[in-house]
Amino acid sequence: MENRPNVLFVTLDSVRHDHTSVHGYERDTTPSLRRIADRPDGATFDSCIAHGKHTPKSSASILTGIYPSVHRFGYEDNTLDPDIETIAERFSKAGYRTVCVSNNAFVSEETGFGRGFDDIVVVPKEPLDIIQTAG
């Protein structure tokens, strides 16, 4: 078995960078993310910029690494061009097991955002439902 790192890729939608404790906010707003980032093998990125003002276009850019004007998601329709590779597809081709845990309806096979994930777990938006789903 190959010795390679586990990769946990976390994105947050509609969250202010300067209001997260992982980035120094005085209130402990993101304790779990801070613990992960503070590990010797943890990392955070301070220069991440949304490439669209709407979640779908930004999410497409995050998952593909290309600008909305190139991937065109959300312009004509809400389907990612099958010729555009996602980060999950790249990890899958490299032999990683890929799992997406999301409450975002756009992460699906129908939109193309789900391509490359071995499993997609849809997490409910209500806290009690999240506990029941995880349990």
Question: Where in the sequence are the language-model features?
Answer:
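Catalytic domains that recognize anionic headgroups
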Residues: 1-135
